[in-house]
Amino acid sequence: MNNCQLPLSDVQSRQDHRRLDIDKVGVKNIRYPIVVKDRSVGSQSTTARINMYVNLPHQFKGTHMSRFLEVLAENQRAISIENLPKLLKEVKQRLDAEEAHIELDFPYFITKKAPVSGVEALMDYQVHFSGVMRGNAYQLTLTVEVPVTSLCPCSKEISAYGAHNQRSHVKVSVQFSQFVWIEEVVDLVERNASCELFTILKRPDEKFVTEKAYDNPKFVEDMVRDLADELTHDPRISWFAVESENFESIHNHSAYAFIEGGQRS
């Protein structure tokens, strides 16, 4: 019984003699409520999967995992994208680290109207924010994954009628000097696809999207090039990466393309 009153060993703080720094160590897949800026209504509450890491110098055996969760718990009413620099600074201080990383992955919802009937419904998009603080330097990367329709130009050209089309997932990552709305990235992708997707379509809407896709055929190469061209000419964007995966309807494989531009921090 008396042994229980002795100080508990801090194993993580012991010396490690392998002289190998660790770039990232921490916790993954923490589910937590967050608040995100919404262009239409001001803000939106959602649930994120959060990853938190720090670097670990070679002389330490381990990091103190519970301290990541303590930072979240102490800021549970104020976890937002705008608050990431504060959270990163606290993580660095609490774990005595030179750099800290926080990643947020969450569904984001936008109300969309069907193109003809005007029926409204929520559409979900997967969004990822990655914040890094090295010393006092802070960098934020926004990634948005947008599902769209792509229709093959070759299939349209060589066929007497019809053309194969499919759902595609387009992922756009940006670093920026001025604020960029999530909705802006979604709009950018959807206007450069053969056609955008909708949650609810009545028959007149279905006719519209079918014909629109047929009138706007796009290879996977076309989509990433068109997006990269617009991002290159946006003065707010310092770096971008664009990738598209087309889930081919006539093949048992996907088509894929990727473009990166600008200077990454």
From Swiss-Prot:
<dbReference type="GO" id="GO:0003934">
    <property type="term" value="F:GTP cyclohydrolase I activity"/>
</dbReference>
<protein>
    <recommendedName>
        <fullName>GTP cyclohydrolase FolE2</fullName>
        <ecNumber>3.5.4.16</ecNumber>
    </recommendedName>
</protein>
<dbReference type="InterPro" id="IPR003801">
    <property type="entry name" value="GTP_cyclohydrolase_FolE2/MptA"/>
</dbReference>
<dbReference type="GO" id="GO:0046654">
    <property type="term" value="P:tetrahydrofolate biosynthetic process"/>
</dbReference>
<comment type="function">
    <text>Converts GTP to 7,8-dihydroneopterin triphosphate.</text>
</comment>
<dbReference type="Pfam" id="PF02649">
    <property type="entry name" value="GCHY-1"/>
</dbReference>
<comment type="similarity">
    <text>Belongs to the GTP cyclohydrolase IV family.</text>
</comment>
<dbReference type="InterPro" id="IPR022838">
    <property type="entry name" value="GTP_cyclohydrolase_FolE2"/>
</dbReference>
<comment type="pathway">
    <text>Cofactor biosynthesis; 7,8-dihydroneopterin triphosphate biosynthesis; 7,8-dihydroneopterin triphosphate from GTP: step 1/1.</text>
</comment>
<keyword id="KW-0378">Hydrolase</keyword>
<feature type="site" description="May be catalytically important">
    <location>
        <position position="152"/>
    </location>
</feature>
